[in-house]
Amino acid sequence: GKMGNPVGHSGPREQKQVGMKKIEAIIKPFKLDEVKEALHDVGVMGLTVTEAKGFGRQKGHTELYRGAEYVVDFLPKVKIEVVLDDDQVDGAIEAIVQAAKTDKIGDGKIFVSPIEQSIRIRTGETGSDAL
């Protein structure tokens, strides 16, 4: 739910410009449930999950195929995307880090970027109301 704001009530058409951010987290697939729970615990309800493959500094393993060695670079990852009000960002990042960390290479990355607008298609609500 939304916390009531102490300042006067603004009508639906007046954009109350609360800043929004998108958090993208690339994590190990087996950590997805833990991360989802952790985000839920800090009040994040909506998220998008995409299966991904990636490689960073983690070097792939080698496989033998028809007598030749190949390096398999891409490792399965999961990408989680969440759009939040600015004031929820730090809590969400902390939740993701705590839940996704194994202290091993390949734990993943988190990227934060500004969101200019959000619209709920069904109702036409915009901004924070659309999250």
Predicted regions and their residues:
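Positively charged, small/polar-rich N-terminal and surface patches that mediate targeting and assembly
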Residues: 2-131
